[in-house]
From Swiss-Prot:
This is Alanine racemase. Belongs to the alanine racemase family. Its cofactor is pyridoxal 5'-phosphate. It is an enzyme of class 5 (isomerase). Pathway: Amino-acid biosynthesis; D-alanine biosynthesis; D-alanine from L-alanine: step 1/1. GO terms for cellular component: cytosol. The modification N6-(pyridoxal phosphate)lysine is found at K33.
Length: 352
């Protein structure tokens, strides 16, 4: 069997949730969209079932999957519905929809709901993707407030640069949000992972923990308070010694500078490892750091082995404990979200 393995450490997931919840101080949604950032939404949700105040997803299908698996917690649809007919499923599965534009608002208001719905009303405080502009927010809020079909309203917005504290955008967005919601009663939600960790003023009634929930610092590098949940590993299944000035891999982009032990490992870009990862991207053999050499192929990669490192059959960590996923992502010119969400053709093992 091909030895590409993903370990999901559910104990680390629980640890991270508890740390973030304590820091936030209010209620905390565990964001499990995109199959929990590639970790497995159902397994992660059940691991957090006795801790979480609720969950957040991106699509109706993601919410339904949690409900049909037995999750009874609040589930927020962060993007709301994509067509008016989906409000039927919102009601059937007791989901909490975000409302971020006029047609979503109007479709919700003209529907005859059998039971009142809890709405998350989104403001565009400066990111300019979705949400009502601050000067339009109060009127959208009033329309919902007057409806007999609306149980309650959570006011929320999303930060564009919370992971870039020096930008000043988070403060600008908070000011816009506070001005646009002035005098409007109800709960609020502003803090994503970066704001939970770094912006106390954004910790309102509800937090939304995404990247940090999975043990990854949104600021790059590592955060000793968090424990990585995903560990991606494989094994060496081939080994050879190349003479100096030998090319390796497609495009002959890497040449050995000396006699070099080369390990062949079972992982490639078809498995989700980034093809853009350059030579010198870190990996670890039995806990000792080494590097990728040559281009990443579809199904395999080549790594450098020094004289002290074991070879054939030994484990190689691609990211997890010794190798920080932020380091891999930075080397490849991408972000850790993309790496985790892209993993496939691997055996998943869940560790309680």
């Amino acid at each position: 069997m091909r030895p590409l393995n993903v370990q999901i450490r559910l104990g680390n997931l629980r640890h991270n949730y508890q740390i973030l919840k304590e820091m936030h101080g209010g209620k905390l949604l565990a964001v499990v969209k995109a199959d929990a950032y590639g970790h497995g939404a159902v397994r992660c949700a059940f691991a957090l079932a006795d801790l979480a105040d609720g969950f957040a997803v991106a699509t109706i299908d993601e919410g339904i999957r949690l409900r049909e698996s037995g999750i009874t917690h609040p589930i927020v649809l962060l993007e709301g519905v994509f067509e008016a007919s989906e409000y039927e499923a919102v009601e059937q599965y007791s989901l909490w929809p975000a409302v971020g534009n006029q047609w979503q608002l109007e479709a919700l208001l003209i529907r005859h709901w059998k039971k009142p719905v809890k709405v998350w009303l989104k403001m565009d405080s400066g990111m300019h993707r979705t949400g009502f502009f601050p000067h339009d927010y109060a009127s959208a809020y009033a329309a919902l407030k007057q409806s007999e079909y609306v149980d309650s309203i959570v006011k929320f917005s999303h930060f564009s640069c919370a992971d870039e504290p020096e930008s000043g955008m988070t403060e600008i967005q908070m000011e816009a949000f506070d001005l646009g919601t002035e005098g409007l009663e109800g709960e609020e939600s502003l803090a994503n992972s970066a704001a939970i960790l770094n912006v106390p003023e954004a910790r309102r009634d509800w937090g939304r923990a995404g990247l940090a929930l999975y043990g990854i610092s949104p600021f790059g590098g590592s955060d000793d308070r968090l424990k990585p949940v995903m560990r991606l590993s494989t094994r060496i299944f081939g080994e050879r010694v190349l003479q100096p000035h030998s090319p390796i891999g497609y495009g002959a982009t890497f040449y050995t500078s000396k006699s070099t032990r080369v390990g062949l490992i079972a992982c490639g870009y078809a498995d989700g490892y980034p093809r853009r990862a350059p030579s010198n991207s870190p990996v670890a053999v039995d806990g000792k750091l080494t590097r990728v050499i040559g281009r990443v192929s579809m199904d395999m990669m080549t790594i450098e082995l020094d004289a002290s490192q074991e070879g054939l059959g030994h484990e190689v960590e691609l990211w997890g404990d010794t190798v920080n996923i932020n380091t891999v992502a930075e080397a490849a010119g991408t972000i850790p979200y993309e790496l985790m969400c892209n993993i496939k053709r691997a055996k998943f093992t869940y560790i309680e």
